[in-house]
Amino acid sequence: MAGQFDSEDRGSWYWGRLSRGDAVSLLQGQRHGTFLVRDSGSIPGDFVLSVSESSRVSHYIVNSLGPAGGRRAGGEGPGAPGLNPTRFRIGDQEFDSLPSLLEFYKIHYLDTTTLIEPVSRSRQNSGVILRQEEVEYVRALFDFNGNDDEDLPFKKGDILKIRDKPEEQWWNAEDMDGKRGMIPVPYVEKCRPSSASVSTLTGGNQDSSHPQPLGGPEPGPYAQPSINTPLPNLQNGPFYARVIQKRVPNAYDKTALALEVGELVKVTKINMSGQWEGECNGKRGHFPFTHVRLLDQQNPDEDFS
C-alpha cells in the first residue's frame, strides 16, 4: 500500500537546516518508510532525503538543477520562489518539484522501502529532537535467555540501554544491573522509559559514556535509490519476492513465516505496518517486508542478484 501523506504539505516533511546526526536521531527506530527532507550540510541549494529502512537510516542526496539541467547556486528552500525554474535529481531520476519526487517514491522503492509517512513533528516539540549524544533505550518484547557468553539475557518488559550497533540484527546493550552484552534486534522495540528507569540505567545522571553520534558528519556517504522498482498492485493478483535475509520467528508466534535466504515468497497482502503476508514452502504467515526483495514479476524464477 502506498503512503497516504500529502506531498504538497511541505511543513510536514521539510525540516530545513537539520544535521545528519539529528536526522538519524529522529528516524532511528521509526517504522520503515518514515522520512524527512532537509538542507544539505555540504552543498548549498541541495537537499537530502533521509529515510528509515532496514534497521538503519539512509540518506539520499537530491541535487537542485537549473532550467538547462545545470547546478543551481544558493539555498532557497523547496518552496521558495526562484528567478529560474528548478528541477531536482535523485540518482538517475529528475523531477519538476520535490512534491513530485516524493509522489514517485510513494510507489517506487528507494532501496528496501517506499515512502510511507513524514516523521512526526511532535518528536521535536516534545523535546525528542535528540541530541546526537543522547542515549537510546529499547523495551523487550519477548524473553531472551542468550545463546553465547557474549549475549545479554533479558525478560519481556525489561528496559535496556543501547551502547553500540555493531550489526544490523545484533546490538550491544546494558540492563538495569549494569550487565552488558549482545541482544537480538527483533526481540525489542524502541521506547522512551520513565525518568526512574533512565536514572537507574544511567547511574543517576548523564555522564560522558554516551554512544558516538549515529550518522556521521556531512558529506555522505549517500545511498543511491533503486529506480524502476514500483510497489506492485495486488489487484492484479499476488506477486513474488526473493528472501534476502534469514528470519527465525519466535517459537510462540505461530502466524510468523520462517525465511531462508534465496527462497521464493508469494506475497498475498501488503500492510502499512511493514508486515506483509504470503506463502513460502507451502506455509502461510506474516514477515517483515525488509527481509525480501521484489522480483521481475514476468520472470520470477530467474536467478536473483
From Swiss-Prot:
Q: Which GO terms describe its cellular component?
A: cytoplasm; membrane; plasma membrane; protein-containing complex
Q: Which residues form a coiled coil?
A: none
- Keywords annotated in UniProt: Cell membrane, Cytoplasm, Membrane, Phosphoprotein, Proto-oncogene, Repeat, SH2 domain, SH3 domain
Which residues does the UniProt record annotate as the domain SH2? 13-119
Q: How is it modified after translation?
A: Phosphorylated on Tyr-222 upon cell adhesion. Results in the negative regulation of the association with SH2- and SH3-binding partners, possibly by the formation of an intramolecular interaction of phosphorylated Tyr-222 with the SH2 domain. This leads finally to the down-regulation of the Crk signaling pathway. Proline isomerization at Pro-238 by PPIA acts as a switch between two conformations: an autoinhibitory conformation in the cis form, where the tandem SH3 domains interact intramolecularly, and an activated conformation in the trans form.
Q: Where in the cell is it found?
A: Cytoplasm; Cell membrane
This chain's function reads: May mediate attachment-induced MAPK8 activation, membrane ruffling and cell motility in a Rac-dependent manner. Involved in phagocytosis of apoptotic cells and cell motility. Involved in cell branching and adhesion. May regulate the EFNA5-EPHA3 signaling.
| Quaternary structure, from the entry | Interacts with ABL1, C3G, SOS, MAP4K1, MAPK8 and DOCK1 via its first SH3 domain. Interacts with BCAR1, CBL, PXN and GAB1 via its SH2 domain upon stimulus-induced tyrosine phosphorylation. Interacts with several tyrosine-phosphorylated growth factor receptors such as EGFR, PDGFR and INSR via its SH2 domain.
Report the sequence similarity comment from the record.
Answer: Belongs to the CRK family.
Q: What is this protein called?
A: Adapter molecule crk
